[in-house]
Amino acid sequence: KPVFLLDEPEAFLHPPYARRMGEILGKNFIENESLNNVFISTHSSFLLQGLISSCSEELTIVRLNRDGDMRCAKVLSNKEILSLIDRSDFSAEYLDALFSSEAVLVEGPRDAAVYRKLISEFDTNYSGLFVSVNGKPGFESIKKFYDSAGIRCKVITDFDLLDNNDIFKRVSNLFITTNDKRNEIREVRNSLERFYRELEGCPGGQRDKMPEIVKSHYKHQVYENLPDDLGVSVEEMLRLLAREGLVVLSSGELKSLFEAYGVEYVHGSNKWLTNAFSYMANHSCDELRDIPAVAILLQAFIPEEQRG
């Protein structure tokens, strides 16, 4: 039986039509008994969605990757891809990362816009794809999927990742693999919670629900009132995590990133986004690099010799 080769059939098609083409191709190839195998190359997550919807049981997805002179092929799990597509918050972005050199998971679209702009200020050639996972609980499963697909994956998250011990443990374990380092960062995280609780007169353990007044300390001005030794430990923990690819914003929430530099902390406001872009556009790389939270973020993205 013949083998059929098809190169980028989605070329020049809008996304909805690329998806429809995938559905039609999948259905027709399955019904065509004269064919032995069909090989389709694509750069379209929409064509891929169409193929998956029409012939998932007959489909084998292979991701090709080139790193310098090295080339490798990775067979992806259909079960994992179907699980990803079945998520209630599924976006084509999740599959777009299959065609990218690197995925950067962030909490929401605003985060993606700001961090993309910020990193491009230091590296205009950065080609990683910023993927919004709609909140911290999405980090773990999507990071695991990209790991299994052979895609380099980083995470940028607000500081309040640390206010939930369980989520912090599961996400940080994806980046920190040695028990001694895991125990080290967990002890720092727990010491920080104890301090915030004592500061507000709300004693309790990790299993007790954290009062909102305690949670507020994770939102912005997170170093305020911290003892020097605890502040140093938190800083060292954040730098360690960043070097491994997990960036925890040391200023608190995204909206606190430029707060100390005149960009007012405003929760859920488009005005903040406009002001943040204006701030980045009007300040040099050296000035941006002097912001502590930015300096930590750069450890995950910019080689040390280029950081200045």
Language-model features: locations:
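Acidic, Mg2+-coordinating catalytic modules of nucleic-acid enzymes
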Residues: 87-105, 109-308
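Switch/communication elements of ASCE P-loop NTPase nucleotide-binding domains
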Residues: 1-96, 299-307
